Amino acid sequence: MFTKLMTAIFGSSNDRTLRRLNKRVAQINRLEAEFEKLTDEQLQAKTAEFKQRLAEGATLDSLLHEAFATVREASKRVLGMRHFDVQLIGGMVLTERNIAEMRTGEGKTLTATLPCYLNALTGKGVHVVTVNDYLARRDAETNRPLFEFLGMTVAVNIPGLPSDVKRQAYLADITYATNSELGFDYLRDNLAHSKEERFQRPLHYALVDEVDSILIDEARTPLIISGPAEDATQIYQAIDKVIPHLIAQDKEDTEEYTGDGDFTLDLKSKQAHLTERGQVKVENILTKMGLMHEGESLYHPARISLLHHVYAALRAHKLFEVNVDYIVKDGEIVIIDEHTGRTMAGRRWSDGLHQAIEAKEGVNIQGENQTVASITYQNYFRLYEKLAGMTGTADTEAFEFQQIYGLDTVVIPTNRPMIRDDKTDLMFKSEPEKFQAVIKDIQDCIARKQPVLVGTISIEKSEALSEALKQAGIPHKVLNAKFHAQEAEIVADAGYPGAVTIATNMAGRGTDIVLGGNWKAEIAKLENPTQEQIDEIKAKWQERHDIVMQAGGLHIIGTERHESRRIDNQLRGRSGRQGDPGSSRFYLSLDDALMRIYLNEGKLNMMRKAFTEEGEAMESKLLTKVIASAQAKVEAYNFDGRKQLLQYDDVANEQRKAIYEQRNYLLETDDISAMINTVREDVFNAVIDQYIPPQSIEEMWDVPALENRLKQEFGMELPIVKWLEAEDDLHEETLRERIINIAKEQYQAKEAMVGAEVMRSFEKGVMLQNLDELWKEHLSAMDYLRKGIHLRGYAQKDPKQEYKKESFAMFTDMLDHLKSNVISVLSRIQVRSQEEVEQAERERQAHAEQESSHYHAEGEGQDFSDLHIGRNEPCPCGSGKKYKHCHGSKAKYS
């Protein structure tokens, strides 16, 4: 009550921010007349002037008004578009490291030019982050003429680019890239064997488009680069045969309740658990198969991997459905993104789940991979010096953006009032009844020539609805993961009078649905259109546009509520752009997943009884509250999951940063001999301490064991026993000093044989190779620790604190191993000539390159030839030429 009163008097935080920024908009507007008088050359010279002023100590904020006025004027001349005042506000919000919520159709692409230009003046590079290759290419080509007019270089970074092209892309002032490619390039840079192989500069400013999709929906997806591990194909096939013998149980066993099933399912977290009865049954089956010995337990340390396979197979069979979570395409399992409905070619589930699904579907089982490098989007984007984002739907997740990324959300007002009619939800008893009502609504729209976009939550649902529409004789197009290649074309046609388009979730997001159809797309299909053809296309479009406007604009039908209100708002947001008319309605049933999973059986039964007739629809405020309550539960559950992930990943992140800093130092430094000398002393002191404890008497020493250790580990044959017999005054300190000095002298003798330069290169190579190998093993160990740490909760211990403590101990142990391994290799290496060392170094590099050639990045793309690029589309390499005149011509003749 008090908060509402204060807001009524002083306005909300958002209102106060907008009032402050409106004053700055007025200052930019006052410059417009002055900048209109400038010649093109004078306007272009502003870039050099701003850079000079920055070099002399000016701040970006002090240049903002003039820089924005420059971009606005250049846009009018080059693109024929003038930034609205609300777009100037959006640009300032993005400059101030915030998230701008701008409704669909309000011109986010043009708004982005303002902060991009301003931040690019520093010369440190700007990354504009998009969710897919198509949007990266499209936005870069849209804004390229404007940026190049102002003297800025523009490039595109997408999967499949040659290394030299990718390196050039990162050197551009403004680089458009996909979120996954940026993350993978960061990981690849930290697997590079020389500084010349790296791609990225220090991360300066990132502007994330569709920020909610990248920083929230994909936050729990780690970016992983992996290499091949041992083959376990036969085990996956054997375990797959076990699952049909197991029976599901409704709930977990407790002291009061013991079920008669073998496993339970947690639908929220998509996890499966064996009951005690199920464990015994599985052990008996595996023993008969010869995979276990009589009397052995699945929880025996030697059999834990089998338990891991059983759980993966259970999840594959009982929790992951074909055409919902994945599709089978060309004999491979292709994941479907649950948030966008798009396929994610190249991505694989971890923890053996992908192989278990391959076994279930009877396709070729590809080998498991070992993690070589990984990072989450949460931690990658927090590496940027400045981070900002924009989307049409962020306000519902404002708390999470602030908590995790420190980003405030500012809702930008629309340029024209929003007049879309959002109708109340209709609830039906069953799915068939709901589909009948949807078909009736679609038929009404077609009769008045109103285009309809129907949103579904999965491929399975979209195909079921498509089948129902076919039976009703309604022509329509389906936009889902199976038809990804035609996505832009289907979206372009979705605004035609009476057009019916079914879309999974937010497939096609980022592309506006233009009422009457996309006339620009029609013109783009023509090779060299004449002015007469262009005028004819525009005239026909205007006729169609008027028909659609009169019919009520684009009508949105949601066939199911999503887990998140934000995704529902995104679907609605496709209609009513820039003051256009539009309408939306959600059709629900008690069979919907949201209802079944998040409402208890009592509530569902009560709601079923409320329906008295078949086909009856329920419409009430109470219903809206029930749905909102279910969605709030899911959002809270998902937020908690992302927060938990971050808390655990933050531990690994500190270690990752330390290792990558050390690695970068090694790549940048030619001479690490001082480091090697320090490490040598540390290692020898640690070894000697084990056999000759500090400040101890001679009777406590184990000299023969020390002699043996020095020989085995460092190739040093030292007669320490004889020294002690011959020299009475040889005490602990002098003995320690002598051993370390001899080690140094032997090493210096080797260096004299091959030369200092070769030895420095060899030291660096050995250090890098050991660091990479041990870090890879450490990542696997951390994965295992993370998976089992929750069990500490049963011992009344805080799992997070235990994870921190144990992972730190593991990290310290890894560093000790690194030091010991490096000194051992450098001490034992036998060199007779410079040529031998150079040959050893060449072999080491060849081995490293061979290993890296097997690395696989989840979500990595393909070569240009597989990207389905139109001949007249811009080339994805970022050259600015048409594809047919650039890499397209090379592809044609290669």
UniProtKB/Swiss-Prot annotation:
One of its GO terms (biological process) is protein targeting. It catalyses: ATP + H2O + cellular proteinSide 1 = ADP + phosphate + cellular proteinSide 2. GO terms for cellular component: cell envelope Sec protein transport complex; cytosol; plasma membrane. It is found in: Cell inner membrane; Cytoplasm. Keywords: ATP-binding, Cell inner membrane, Cell membrane, Cytoplasm, Membrane, Metal-binding, Nucleotide-binding, Protein transport, Translocase, Translocation, Transport, Zinc. Residues 836-870 are annotated as: Disordered. Its cofactor is Zn(2+). Its EC number is 7.4.2.8. It is a peripheral membrane protein. CDD domains: DEXDc_SecA, SF2_C_secA. SUPFAM superfamilies: Helical scaffold and wing domains of SecA, P-loop containing nucleoside triphosphate hydrolases, Pre-protein crosslinking domain of SecA. The keyword Ribosomal protein does not apply. The keyword ATP-binding applies. It is an enzyme of class 7 (translocase). ATP binds at residues 87, 105-109, 512. Coiled coil: none annotated. One of its GO terms (molecular function) is ATP binding. InterPro entries: Helicase_ATP-bd, Helicase_C-like, P-loop_NTPase, SEC_C_motif, SecA, SecA_CS, SecA_DEAD, SecA_motor_DEAD. Its main location: membrane. PANTHER family: CHLOROPLAST PROTEIN-TRANSPORTING ATPASE, SECA INNER MEMBRANE COMPONENT OF SEC PROTEIN SECRETION SYSTEM. Part of the Sec protein translocase complex. Interacts with the SecYEG preprotein conducting channel. Has a central role in coupling the hydrolysis of ATP to the transfer of proteins into and across the cell membrane, serving both as a receptor for the preprotein-SecB complex and as an ATP-driven molecular motor driving the stepwise translocation of polypeptide chains across the membrane. Monomer and homodimer. Part of the essential Sec protein translocation apparatus which comprises SecA, SecYEG and auxiliary proteins SecDF-YajC and YidC. Belongs to the SecA family. This is Protein translocase subunit SecA. The gene is secA.
